[in-house]
């Protein structure tokens, strides 16, 4: 689309590039995790019609991968998956802000790692709701040998050429979607502190420009300070809690 191309040239990013970046980084992080811990179990929250679960089951046939969504979407997704594979598991449903969420964790083996994924979700929650979600994940996941949470977040666009335009667009999105879409954090350290306070012990904030630069040339030294906002529209977070092995 001409507007997308203009944004990529003049703003340094667009919705198209942003979606591709976050999806690619989350997939890369999850693939690395599976290769490091082949026994990892996966729970993806609010995945909608994303084909990620299907793709990963094709790539890793023995993976225990479940999805959680709103009741109506869960029915639609279950039907779609089972048309492709009659053995595809049913998409689960629960309120992630109540103890109903805890029941979902009981369906996984605590002697194995658990990875939780969400994409395009947490900017729709205000800070108190986000904190409640994170505390629920760390509380209900405390008995697992390892607990990982992979998600994306839109930081305040303070270093973007069209920061005011993006802010206005986000307010419009908030009204149109009747949600709390907002920007919560300016720099990676604010995110790390917020996640630490919710019970995570390891928090890595991945900025796409540095990530793809470093992956393109492993001998290249990145000049971006990982503690500063590098200007990307979206970041990926890999938060974890790992038990000390005896």
Give names to the regions the model predicted.
Residues 1-45, 50-246:
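Alpha-helical subdomain
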């Amino acid at each position: 689309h001409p507007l997308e191309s203009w944004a990529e040239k003049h703003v340094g990013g667009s919705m198209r590039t942003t979606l591709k970046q976050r999806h690619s980084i989350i997939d890369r992080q999850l693939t690395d995790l599976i290769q490091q811990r082949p026994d990892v179990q996966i729970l993806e929250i609010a995945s909608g019609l994303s084909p990620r679960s299907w793709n990963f089951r094709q790539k890793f046939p023995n993976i225990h991968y479940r999805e959680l969504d709103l009741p109506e979407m869960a029915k639609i997704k279950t039907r779609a998956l089972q048309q492709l594979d009659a053995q595809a598991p049913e998409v689960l449903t629960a309120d992630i802000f109540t103890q109903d969420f805890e029941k979902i964790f009981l369906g996984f083996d605590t002697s194995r790692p658990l990875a939780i994924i969400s994409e395009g979700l947490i900017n729709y929650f205000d800070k108190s709701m986000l904190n409640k979600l994170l505390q629920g994940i760390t509380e209900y996941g405390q008995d697992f040998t390892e607990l990982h949470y992979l998600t994306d977040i839109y930081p305040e666009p303070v270093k973007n050429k069209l920061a005011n335009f993006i802010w206005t667009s986000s307010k419009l999105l908030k009204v149109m979607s009747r949600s709390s879409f907002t920007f919560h954090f300016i720099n990676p350290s604010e995110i790390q502190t917020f996640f630490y306070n919710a019970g995570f012990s390891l928090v890595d904030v991945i900025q796409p420009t540095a990530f793809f630069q470093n992956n393109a040339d492993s001998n290249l030294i990145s000049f971006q300070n990982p503690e500063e906002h590098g200007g990307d529209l979206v970041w990926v977070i890999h938060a974890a809690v790992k038990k000390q092995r005896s």
